[in-house]
Amino acid sequence: DELVHLLGDEVSEVDFSKKPTVIMMVGLQGSGKTTTSGKIAKLIKTKYAKKPLLVAGDIYRPAAVDQLVTLGKQLDVPVYEKGTSESAENIVKGAMNYAALNNNDVIIIDTAGRLHIDEPLMQELANVKEIAKPDEILLVVDSLTGQDIVNVAASFNEKLSITGAVLTKL
């Protein structure tokens, strides 16, 4: 209830009229951002007949890049990845250019998990937000996190103005 109160009671749909529509996935480590990114890409491709692009923006966990590439192959959705040697900001810049050249309707940016109190990593998210200008910023939350999630959501919202939340592992 507190999370709903924090984000607002109004339900809204993603507006796909702007091309590309940019969705940025944020949250704590292990919350399910990468898997959720793939699920959202599948939904956007099948239900809305859009051409999504997955962006591997987690430069701290090589397995996340591999996982997203595997999901992309399974879903027949392209994945823009540069491994872990470039900054998240540079990867997102490259992805924006790639999407423009390849007519991708929707860009889904999978970011690295981080603690809300880790200021340098939170600043990285703010930088990515500035570059990508996302239409949606979704906080991915492990449903087993407990009451502290209200503080986590408030911190992410203060820094990024999140537009929604996804509860995982229900």
Residue ranges of each PLM-predicted region?
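Short, glycine/acidic-enriched loop or turn micro-motifs at the edges of active sites
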Residues: R61, T84, G113, T145
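Thr-Gly-centered strand-to-loop micro-motif
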Residues: V55-A56, E81-K82, T111, L139-V141, ...
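Conserved catalytic-core segment of NTP-binding enzymes
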Residues: S87-L101, H116-L170
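Gly/Ser/Thr-rich helix-start
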Residues: S31-K33, D58, R114, Q147, ...
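Primarily NTPase-proximal linker/entry elements flanking Walker-type ATP/GTP-binding cores
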Residues: D1-G57, A64-T84, V92-A100, D105-I109
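Short, glycine/polar-rich helix-capping loops at beta-to-alpha or helix-loop-helix junctions
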Residues: P62-L68, I149-V152
